[in-house]
Amino acid sequence: MAIPGRQYGLILPKKTQQLHPVLQKPSVFGNDSDDDDETSVSESLQREAAKKQAMKQTKLEIQKALAEDATVYEYDSIYDEMQKKKEENNPKLLLGKDRKPKYIHNLLKAVEIRKKEQEKRMEKKIQREREMEKGEFDDKEAFVTSAYKKKLQERAEEEEREKRAAALEACLDVTKQKDLSGFYRHLLNQAVGEEEVPKCSFREARSGIKEEKSRGFSNEVSSKNRIPQEKCILQTDVKVEENPDADSDFDAKSSADDEIEETRVNCRREKVIETPENDFKHHRSQNHSRSPSEERGHSTRHHTKGSRTSRGHEKREDQHQQKQSRDQENHYTDRDYRKERDSHRHREASHRDSHWKRHEQEDKPRARDQRERSDRVWKREKDREKYSQREQERDRQQNDQNRPSEKGEKEEKSKAKEEHMKVRKERYENNDKYRDREKREVGVQSSERNQDRKESSPNSRAKDKFLDQERSNKMRNMAKDKERNQEKPSNSESSLGAKHRLTEEGQEKGKEQERPPEAVSKFAKRNNEETVMSARDRYLARQMARVNAKTYIEKEDD
């Protein structure tokens, strides 16, 4: 049964003490008997009965709560509504949700514009390449995809839109219009009723302006006098606009003209000021000059002439006022004219200054670039001159150093050759074993030389032959020079020496004839300068042949 006066809905239950079931201690011996089974069954039945009773009770409570309020158990929907109200009341969350990007739209537009410009550049590049080809591939078929056709169509539409926008801007822009046709078209549309007449017009604006009340100052001009002044100003403006050469005329005028105009205006002012004072002084002097008797006589006349004098005085005052108004008008017109002229001159001067400044700003970077270029050219020429002078001095110094060293080397080499030839002859004469050993070495060297010749290119072989011939010619010349030098001693010694030489030459010729043609070898002992030089030449020839045969290029070390 439900407890009367119980609340329903979202009610937090109070913490109740949990009832722990009492656990029965097992028996000491641990023997489970039949009595224990019976007790456990009865306990389980009691528990189930208690649960059923509780379920019935809760069902009854639920039914009663629903009967009182149908929305008692709608917890989720109520909670969601509460959260929505919180979010609506919190402005920060609303700003976070409705927040839109500030800059991404402009960036995306800029990206699209750049893409279009890039496509236009690529098309121009392709067009140039086709022009360079000069119709080589006109016979070939051109394959165009549907996407490319679509892109071309879109581009043509965009170009048409841009042209329309440019034409509209040119029509609406006043600076781009050549005549007043656009203005008259607007007037016609307004008259017909296609366009609405603007609310604010010049008349309404003029009527809205309140006229200033005169405050009684002497410098102020009345409203009547203001109208002719405005007319004069308008006339002067029209004259200035009609005369296009007025600017040059104003510039050509000297300071003398300005002084003349100022003197005229000052004279007019002095006349205006002096006229009432002179009239007043003249009237007083006449009164003072009269005697008292005359005053008595004139008193009777004064009444008769009073009306006349008063009328004349009024006329004078009217004339004086008219003169003052005219002078003031002239003064104001002159002043306005001078102001306009000065402002026009000032505008011209400022325009010239701005024009000159603009030209100077444009000329500055050009002059700077020209100076930098001239400095670079001058530096290059100077460096070249310095470099050429240094090279010439270096070459001279090297030549001066090499000349004496070359002379000394030649002398030393010639001496060494002579000594070596002497030693060699003595060895040949004294030792036959040395000759046999040298023959063997020469044979081995000649065989190696032939192998190298076979391996080397035909160019190197031809060079080797030519060098061998030169070497043999030099040897003969050296032998002849030695013979001439040895003929100078006494006749007895010369006769004996001649016989000895003849015998030696005969022996050497026989030996040379006995030697095979391979006797001359590149590996023969290098005992003089000629043989050393020929070996160098052969080595260089072999290197050149190898370089020519190579398919690649080796990097040269500095």
From Swiss-Prot:
Region named Disordered: 21-54, 204-534
Gene Ontology cellular component annotations, sorted alphabetically: nuclear speck; nucleoplasm; nucleus; ribonucleoprotein complex
Main location: nucleus
Top-rank lineage group of the source organism: Eukaryota
Pfam families per UniProt: NRP1_C, NSRP1_N
Residue runs in coiled coils: 104-170, 379-427
Amino acid composition bias (Basic and acidic residues), ranges on this chain: 204-215, 250-280, 311-442, 449-487, 501-517
InterPro entries: NRP1_C, Nsrp1, NSRP1_N
Subcellular location, record wording: Nucleus; Nucleus speckle
Positions of post-translational Phosphothreonine modification: T275
Keyword vocabulary terms for this entry: Coiled coil, Disease variant, Epilepsy, Intellectual disability, Isopeptide bond, mRNA processing, mRNA splicing, Nucleus, Phosphoprotein, RNA-binding, Ubl conjugation
Biased composition (Basic residues): 299-310
Numbered residues of crosslink Glycyl lysine isopeptide (Lys-Gly) (interchain with G-Cter in SUMO2): K199, K210, K281
Compositional bias ranges of the Polar residues kind: 216-226
GO molecular function: mRNA binding; RNA binding
Region (Necessary for alternative splicing activity): 106-170
Tissue expression as described in the entry: Expressed in dendritic cells, T-cells, B-cells and natural killer cells. Expressed in secondary lymphoid organs such as spleen and mesenteric, axillary and brachial lymph nodes.
GO biological process: developmental process; in utero embryonic development; mRNA processing; regulation of alternative mRNA splicing, via spliceosome; RNA splicing
Expression triggers: Up-regulated in motile T-cells.
Modified residues (Phosphoserine): S27, S33, S248, S254, S255, S457
Subunit structure: Interacts (via C-terminus) with SRSF1. Interacts (via C-terminus) with SRSF2.
Disease: Neurodevelopmental disorder with spasticity, seizures, and brain abnormalities: An autosomal recessive disorder characterized by developmental delay apparent in infancy, impaired intellectual development with poor or absent speech, epilepsy, variable microcephaly, hypotonia, and spastic cerebral palsy. Brain abnormalities include simplified gyral pattern, defects of the operculum, and vermian hypoplasia. Death in early childhood may occur.
Family, per entry: Belongs to the NSRP1 family.
Record's function text: RNA-binding protein that mediates pre-mRNA alternative splicing regulation.
Protein name, as recorded: Nuclear speckle splicing regulatory protein 1
UniProt source species: Homo sapiens
